[in-house]
Design a protein with these regions (language model features):
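A glycine-rich (often HGG/GG-containing) alpha/beta subdomain
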Residues: 1-112
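Adenosine-phosphate binding glycine-rich loop
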Residues: 22-28, 39, 254-259, 263-379
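Internal alpha-helical scaffold of NAD(P)-dependent oxidoreductase catalytic cores
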Residues: 69-87, 129, 133-136, 147-151, ...
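Glycine/serine-rich phosphate-binding loop and adjoining beta1-alpha1 elements at the start
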Residues: 83-181
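Glycine-rich adenosine-cofactor-binding loop
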Residues: 148, 164-206, 213
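Short, well-ordered alpha-helix to beta-strand connector turns
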Residues: 183, 206, 234, 257, ...
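Adenosine-nucleotide cofactor-binding segment
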Residues: 191, 206-230, 241-244
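Rossmann-like NAD(P)-binding element
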Residues: 225-249, 259-261, 265-266
Length: 380
C-alpha cells in the first residue's frame, strides 16, 4: 500500500537537539503560509505535530517523494535562518504506508523516550483537529486521524498503553530525586498542560509543591515575583512554561539557587542563569537508555501492526466503494431502461415474462460482481 498519497518528515529527540526542534515551531499563520506554498506542489493537506520529543510534518500528496524533499529542505532552511553553528540534523522521511506505520508507532508511544507514553496520543489528535479547524486537512488525513485514534483506544482497552504519568513529567521527577532526594521541595513554574501534569505527579509521589504562573490564582498559583521569596524553601524548580524565547533570569530568583529542571521547548532558562545554577534541560533528560519491558514493547508493536492491517483493509474497501456504486447504477439502467426498450416489438413472446427473467439474470450478475469485490477486499 505504498501508493498511499502520504509523506511524513520530522526530527525527534534522537535526531535533533531541543533548539533545533524549537526552531521548527510554527503558529497558525506560519502553517497557512507553508500550506499555501505546498498547494502549488500538489499537496492537499498538512498536519503539524509539535511535542517536547518531536516535530513532524505530515502531508497528503500524490507526489510524495518530491514533497518530502521540499519539507526536508524547508527544515534545513529554518535552521539556517536561526543561525545555528555546526552541521544540521538529518530529518527522517516516510512515504505511503510507512508514514502510517510511523504515525501509529508515535501514537502508541513506541517512538517516545518513555515507552508507552500516553500524552503524545492526545497531542497527535489535537494536531489533526487543528488541521481540520484551519481548513488545511483533506479526506485522506481525516480518515488517518480517525484511525490513529482507534489504535490508541484499542491499546487502552487492552491495557497495553503506558500509565498516564509516563511522559516528560516523569523524567523531571526522576531528575529531581536523583539530585535532591525523595523528599525534595519542588516549585513548578507554568500551569499549562505539562505543568499541571507535573504538579499532579509530584504531589501524588508525596512532594511538597509550590505553583507559580504568569496569571496568579490559576490552580492556586502564586505570581512569578514570589519565586525569589521562596527560593530558600525550594530544593528544585521545574520550569514548564511555553514562551518562544528564554525568559527566566537570575533576577527572578533569590540568593540561594535551587536545582532547575527546564522542560520547555525552546529552553526557558537564559544562558546566564544556566551558568549560575545547576540546570537540567530537555536534552539532558532525553539521553541514555531507559529499562525497556520487552514483552510490553512487543505487545505495542503487535497492536500497531494489527491497526495498520485494519487501516489497509479499510482503504481497499474505501477505494472499491465507487465500483460497488457504479455496479448498482449499471444494473438499474440495464434492468429498468435499456431492457424494456430492447423487448419492445416482440411478437408472440410475453414481454413481461422475458423482462422478469432478464432482470433475474442481471440481479444474479450484480450480486456475483459484488461478492467478487468483497472477496477481493478481504483478500487484500
Amino acid at each position: 500500500m505504498n501508493h498511499l498519497p502520504l509523506a511524513l518528515v520530522g526530527v525527534d529527540f534522537r535526531r535533533a537537539a531541543t533548539r533545533h526542534r524549537a526552531a521548527l515551531a510554527m503558529d497558525e499563520a506560519a502553517c497557512q503560509a507553508l500550506m499555501t506554498t505546498l498547494r502549488g506542489h500538489g499537496v492537499s493537506g498538512l498536519v503539524v505535530l509539535e511535542t517536547c520529543n518531536r516535530t513532524e510534518w505530515l502531508v497528503a500528496s500524490e507526489r510524495t517523494t518530491w514533497v518530502a524533499q521540499l519539507l526536508e529542505a524547508h527544515m534545513v532552511h529554518c535552521w539556517q535562518q536561526a543561525g545555528f553553528d555546526g552541521p544540521a540534523p538529518k530529518p527522517y522521511r516516510f512515504e505511503g504506508e510507512d508514514s502510517v506505520r510511523h504515525l501509529f508507532r508515535v501514537a502508541a508511544g513506541l517512538e517516545s523516550f518513555v515507552l508507552g507514553e500516553r500524552q503524545v496520543a492526545g497531542q497527535l489528535q489535537r494536531a489533526f483537529e487543528s488541521a481540520r479547524a484551519a481548513q488545511r486537512s483533506c479526506s485522506t488525513l481525516n480518515v488517518l486521524g480517525s484511525w490513529s485514534g482507534r489504535v490508541v483506544r484499542k491499546l487502552q482497552r487492552r491495557g497495553a498503553h503506558g500509565v498516564e504519568s509516563a511522559g516528560v513529567e516523569l523524567l523531571a521527577l526522576e531528575a529531581v530525586r536523583r539530585r535532591c532526594g525523595q523528599h525534595a521541595r519542588i516549585g513548578v513554574v507554568g500551569l499549562g498542560e505539562i505543568g499541571q501534569r507535573c504538579v499532579h505527579l509530584f504531589a501524588q509521589r508525596g512532594h511538597s509543591i509550590r505553583r507559580y504562573n504568569r496569571s496568579p490564582g490559576v490552580g492556586g498559583a502564586l505570581p512569578l515575583e514570589a519565586i525569589a521569596e521562596h527560593c530558600e524553601q525550594l530544593d528544585a524548580l521545574v520550569v514548564a512554561t511555553g514562551a518562544r524565547t528564554a525568559w527566566l533570569e537570575r533576577a527572578h530568583l533569590g540568593a540561594q539557587l535551587p536545582v532547575i529542571v527546564d522542560i520547555g521547548s525552546p529552553q526557558q532558562v537564559t544562558a546566564s542563569l544556566a551558568d549560575a545554577a545547576e540546570t537540567i534541560d530537555l536534552d539532558a533528560l532525553l539521553v541514555g537508555q531507559r529499562p525497556v519491558d520487552q514483552h510490553r514493547r512487543e505487545a505495542l508493536e503487535g497492536e500497531v501492526e494489527l491497526g495498520l492491517a485494519d487501516f489497509r483493509l479499510s482503504e481497499v474497501r474505501r477505494g472499491l466503494r465507487h465500483v460497488v456504486e457504479q455496479n448498482q447504477r449499471t444494473y438499474e439502467e440495464l434492468a429498468y431502461a435499456r431492457l424494456p426498450e430492447a423487448l419492445e416489438g416482440l411478437g408472440e413472446v410475453d414481454p413481461k415474462e422475458v423482462e422478469a427473467k432478464m432482470r433475474s439474470l442481471l440481479r444474479d450478475y450484480s450480486r456475483a460482481v459484488l461478492r467478487a469485490v468483497e472477496d477481493s477486499s478481504e483478500a487484500s
